[in-house]
């Protein structure tokens, strides 16, 4: 069952299932979350992650995979 993503908003912290920081929400674009490029984890680029990875969104967006795995699989935005 997919998580309710309606509570996700700009500047929410995104963490992995291990509680480690992944990024900060810039915006949601359909079924994709765009992370800010100014975040310390971003390397100065926007990255995109699918909303399918969201486990919960209650003040913090928690993913269903550890931070390192999410960061190795995210897509850099053009």
Short names for language-model regions:
Residues 1-78:
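Peripheral interaction segments used for macromolecular assembly
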């Amino acid at each position: 069952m997919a998580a309710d993503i309606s509570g996700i908003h700009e500047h929410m912290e995104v963490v992995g299932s291990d509680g480690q920081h992944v990024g900060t929400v810039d915006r949601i674009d359909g079924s994709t979350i765009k992370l800010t490029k100014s975040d310390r984890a971003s390397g100065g680029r926007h990255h995109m992650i699918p909303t399918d990875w969201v486990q919960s969104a209650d003040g913090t967006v928690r993913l269903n995979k550890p931070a390192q795995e999410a960061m190795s699989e995210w897509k850099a935005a053009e």
